[in-house]
Curated annotation (Swiss-Prot):
Highest taxon listed in the record's lineage: Archaea
Pathways per UniProt: Membrane lipid metabolism; glycerophospholipid metabolism
Family: Belongs to the glycerol-1-phosphate dehydrogenase family.
Record InterPro entries: G1P_dehydrogenase_arc (IPR023002), G1PDH (IPR032837), Glycerol_DH (IPR016205)
Cofactor section: Zn(2+)
Organism: Sulfurisphaera tokodaii (strain DSM 16993 / JCM 10545 / NBRC 100140 / 7)
Cystine pairings recorded for this chain: none
Entry's Gene Ontology molecular function annotations: glycerol-1-phosphate dehydrogenase (NAD+) activity; glycerol-1-phosphate dehydrogenase (NADP+) activity; metal ion binding
Binding site for Zn(2+): D170, H250, H266
Transmembrane segments: none
Annotated positions binding substrate: D123, D170, H254
Keyword Transmembrane: no
Protein name: Glycerol-1-phosphate dehydrogenase [NAD(P)+]
Cofactor binding remark: Binds 1 zinc ion per subunit.
Taxonomic lineage from the root: Archaea, Thermoproteota, Thermoprotei, Sulfolobales, Sulfolobaceae
Amino acid sequence: MELKEHIIDLPKKVYIGYDIIDNIKEYILSLNLSGPFLIVTGPLVRKIITDKIIENFKDESVEVVEVKIASIDEVNKVEEMAKGSRINTIIGVGGGNIIDVAKYVAYRIGKEFVSLPTAPSHDGITSPFASIKGLGKPTSVKAKGPIAIIADINVLASAPRRLINAGIGDTIGKITAVRDWQLAAKLRGEYYGDYTASLALMSAKHALSCAKILDKDVRAGVRVLTEALISSGVAMGMAGSTRPASGSEHLFAHAIEILYPDKALHGELVALGTILMAYIHGINWKKIKKAMKKVGLPTKAKQLGIPDEIIIKALTIAHTIRPERYTILGDRGLTWEAAEKIAKETGIID
């Protein structure tokens, strides 16, 4: 399918290295970004990292606001503060929730956004999309893509291993997401970008290679993962949608998040969904599952405390989460019996 217009939204600069948060002011000013600046962060992150960043901005006008979750209430709070202080640039310092709030507010008020992630837990650190609770759906919405990403590997490598593994899980999901995209292009005439899809798959390949590296050198492994997450976000920016990074595995994850909220990390659910959807696609799901085990990702629902019936129910409703997004689940989805069989044969449930 040919598109009349295709807009590619990419970062202007990506800074990646060790102890580079000390250079943040230099980076910001080199991009000709002006104050007042608003730093969106979290309570824990502020104590460890954000206060250090604020010291670097002592000659600039800087405001700080703390958020806990990516909800529309938090978005409204941050937006009100940004407008009241006539903010020109928003800097997100934290994990996925904080980054999502920061870039969604930047999108709503038309200001530049800088991403400074503190955990490599998902590819939202780069993408022009955000997941915000309270908008009536658990899927991603358009947001402001970062003009710059500042990825300090020492900061990212200090994140809990579970968050690092979740980032691997989220990135592995590109394997089935791209296959779903190809299916939608073939059966529904959707736009499909071969180069963009290849970039997403390369991200998944590098994420899978992290297991061996992380065990030997955490910082080296986290650098590979961070670059994979950035590449995945870039793929979404090039595609103009989340298609190369989000397919049936994400629909399953979103279904779990609705049925059994706040019990698992997003990347952990995507990882489970990837095993299940790989099975349906006829992809070598056993190889994917084996790689996940090596990383330390959960491969069974009970490892996350999720009841079997929730897994089955999620499989039966996943196709309804985003009806306009065609995937291997089709328009009708799975019956309870089919869902139970798939979940058992893949070992997700006993």
